[in-house]
Amino acid sequence: MSRPLVITEGMMIGVLLMLAPINALLLGFVQSTPDNNKTVREFNVYWNVPTFMCHKYGLRFEEVSEKYGILQNWMDKFRGEEIAILYDPGMFPALLKDPNGNVVARNGGVPQLGNLTKHLQVFRDHLINQIPDKSFPGVGVIDFESWRPIFRQNWASLQPYKKLSVEVVRREHPFWDDQRVEQEAKRRFEKYGQLFMEETLKAAKRMRPAANWGYYAYPYCYNLTPNQPSAQCEATTMQENDKMSWLFESEDVLLPSVYLRWNLTSGERVGLVGGRVKEALRIARQMTTSRKKVLPYYWYKYQDRRDTDLSRADLEATLRKITDLGADGFIIWGSSDDINTKAKCLQFREYLNNELGPAVKRIALNNNANDRLTVDVSVDQV
């Protein structure tokens, strides 16, 4: 007759210690490892594509979550419990074009002339209407792109914001020299630009406190553009990002845009993604209030060739770069123009099932647990 097994307190503690890492992994907890440069992170991919537009053709896109493990709003709603994006919410000051091509100033045109109270009132209305759930727990994205709060960065199509800002100061001080006028225009623009962006974010966090809030595209990098041809972010841009800690400390999530361009080489496309993710991770590491998630915005089409889906090679190389650098996941974005006909919906579903979905599952979500979740946050290499 066998003797009964006696489980001692020491044995029980040993078993619990062995099970603890497994339980933490299954429950999605974040754990530090003995190496201070490594941490265990959850990795999530979000669906921010308006595929609800295809429902009228009998195409439901259930496989997004069921087959590929991508976080998708219930019933494929565009705004739901996982993610909600607010396009140009509120009444930010902006210079817009009317149907005739004439420039019209909305709410003052530039932040230093804008009515913040009016903007916040409209923003609250938009938020209540578009995210009615007060306990919304997902990723909340504020997509405002009319101007940037760093005066220098309003170039190209955004140059009118600098021009108007300078004109206002020159009218007030006709005897000032050009340098003094521009310095004052810069000071005012950045002061009130910060105020509008800060107060908007505060309002969003007050009204939907369970959400993870961030501004689309920030931090910027501008790498692999005509004026910044390197894959690395330019030092000036990085210094300006450091000065924007007022924004990044308040955000819960950093959302750099890593849209690819056809006119780059395959290696440059990987470099573009690497440089922008690396900069977001650098900023995230500097923050003192809380750990900031980094979720790059990823489009499955080439930004400068919108009728062309990303190739399998570009999908695999760039998704692998995002995971290898240690981001917390990424957000798959799509335009309504991508799927505004039945033919486009059918073509996109084929692409999803043949290329995009399998690549996401294979590279981002189906990696070995240690390779996927234990990531090196020392991002010295792009």
From Swiss-Prot:
Residue numbers annotated as active site: 145 (proton donor)
Post-translational modification: N-glycosylated. Glycans found include a majority of small oligosaccharides (Man1-3GlcNAc2), most of which are either alpha 1,3-monofucosylated or alpha 1,3-(alpha 1,6-)difucosylated at the innermost GlcNAc residue, approximately 5% of high-mannose type structures, and 8% contains the terminal trisaccharide GalNAc beta 1-4[Fuc alpha 1-3]GlcNAc beta 1-in beta 1,2-linkage to the core alpha 1,3-mannosyl residue.
Expression across tissues: Expressed in the venom glands of worker bees. It is also detected in the testes of drones but not in the queen-bee venom glands or in pupae.
Enzyme class at the top of the EC tree: hydrolase
EC number, as in UniProt: 3.2.1.35
Annotated compartments: Secreted
Result for mutant: residue 371 to S: In clone HYA-2
Disulfide bonds: 54-345, 221-233
Signal peptide: 1-28
Keyword Membrane among record annotations: no
Key words, A-Z: Allergen, Disulfide bond, Glycoprotein, Glycosidase, Hydrolase, Secreted, Signal, Zymogen
Propiece residues: 29-33
Gene3D superfamilies listed in its UniProt record: Aldolase class I (3.20.20.70)
GO CC aspect terms: extracellular region
InterPro entries linked: Aldolase_TIM, Glycoside_hydrolase_SF, Hyaluronidase, Venom_Hyaluronidase
Catalytic activity: Random hydrolysis of (1->4)-linkages between N-acetyl-beta-D-glucosamine and D-glucuronate residues in hyaluronate
UniProt record, GO biological process: carbohydrate metabolic process; defense response; hyaluronan catabolic process
List of glycosylated residues: 115, 263
Molecular-function GO terms, alphabetical: hyalurononglucosaminidase activity
Family as reported in the entry's similarity comment: Belongs to the glycosyl hydrolase 56 family.
PANTHER family named in the record: HYALURONIDASE
Function statement: Hydrolyzes high molecular weight hyaluronic acid to produce small oligosaccharides.
Summary of subunit composition and partner proteins: Homotetramer.
Protein name (database record): Hyaluronidase
